[in-house]
From Swiss-Prot:
Gene that produces this protein: rplB
GO terms for cellular component: large ribosomal subunit
UniProt protein name: Large ribosomal subunit protein uL2
Presence of keyword Transmembrane: no
GO BP term, pick one: cytoplasmic translation
GO molecular function: rRNA binding; structural constituent of ribosome; transferase activity
InterPro entries membership: NA-bd_OB-fold, Rib_uL2_dom2, Ribosomal_uL2, Ribosomal_uL2_bac/org-type, Ribosomal_uL2_C, Ribosomal_uL2_CS, Ribosomal_uL2_dom3, Ribosomal_uL2_RNA-bd_dom
Species per Swiss-Prot/TrEMBL record: Pseudomonas savastanoi pv. phaseolicola (strain 1448A / Race 6)
Subunit structure of this chain's protein: Part of the 50S ribosomal subunit. Forms a bridge to the 30S subunit in the 70S ribosome.
UniProt-annotated stretches for the region Disordered: 28-54, 224-274
Length: 274
């Protein structure tokens, strides 16, 4: 994987930094694992904007990724190829199982075409294999971690993400997440060994606003540039600083204000994130 800085042949190329991976499949994705993906423009069924800054962008197909990996225990799979997925920052791997079925999974770092992967209690400890947390040695790096047995991976799914298994006590294991948070997870939950691929994703630079628009992201207007009717920071004579601590358009504190309010799962957090 190489980091390529473009020559400034035009204003739109001047700040472009690309992450080039020669191993990525250059053809079409596996058609049976594709689904239609409709665009909402950030609107709900009433036509009202529920998520700002969404709209436009290139047409995409959704890739059906297997986040559970619990119904192919003991069946060996060969990595056919590593593919780009427009729906996520990580790459995906197309697996061909010994029974003839093909599935996509999140591609682990270091796994390439031709590698053998397997899931289940007897799977060897190597990147890409999926096991229950109780079968994974303490100190191992994992990703694609379940929070409820059988629900599928919910933690550490984006590019370069991982967590470290640091303790095992009773029916729980303790994980240290990249954020610094330490939390308990049931040892029956599954995880995949290793870290997620495409860890260089954070080094890329799109270089121009249009590249963001291709991805379906619309501009973000500052509150201080609005009228008082549109935002708490709006209005004023001439340029102003807003006159108060940063808030959202609805008056809630933003830019670093804590928003977590799930007391039900607080007991699972051993140490809050940094």
């Amino acid at each position: 994987m190489a980091i390529v800085k473009c020559k400034p042949t035009s204003p739109g190329r001047r700040f472009v930094v690309k992450v080039v991976n020669q191993e990525l499949h250059k053809g079409a994705p596996h058609a049976p694992l594709l689904e239609k993906k409709s665009k909402s423009g950030g609107r709900n069924n009433n036509g009202r904007i529920t998520t700002r800054h969404i709209g436009g962008g290139h047409k995409q197909h959704y890739r059906l990724v297997d986040f559970r990996r619990n119904d192919k225990d003991g069946i060996a799979a060969t990595v056919e190829r590593i593919e780009y997925d427009p729906n996520r920052t990580a790459h995906i791997a197309l697996l061909l199982y010994a029974d003839g079925e093909r599935r996509y999974i999140i591609a682990p770092k270091g796994v390439s075409a031709g590698d053998q992967l397997i899931a289940g209690a007897l799977a060897p400890i190597k990147p890409g294999n999926a096991l229950q947390l109780r079968n994974i040695p303490v100190g191992s790096t994992v990703h694609g971690i379940e929070l409820k047995p059988g629900k599928g991976a919910q933690i550490a799914r984006s590019a370069g993400a991982s967590a470290q298994l640091i303790a095992r006590e009773g029916v729980y294991v303790t994980l240290r997440l990249r954020s610094g948070e330490m939390r308990k997870v049931l040892s029956e939950c599954r995880a995949t060994l290793g870290e997620v691929s495409n860890s260089e994703h954070s080094l890329r630079s799109l270089g121009k606003a249009g590249a963001k628009r291709w991805r379906g992201v619309r501009p973000t207007v500052r509150g201080v540039a609005m009228n008082p009717v549109d935002h708490p920071h709006g209005g004023g004579e001439g340029r102003t600083s807003g006159g108060r601590h940063p808030v959202s358009p609805w008056g809630f504190p933003t830019k670093g204000a804590k928003t977590r309010g799930n007391k039900r799962t607080d007991k699972m957090i051993v140490r809050r994130r940094k």
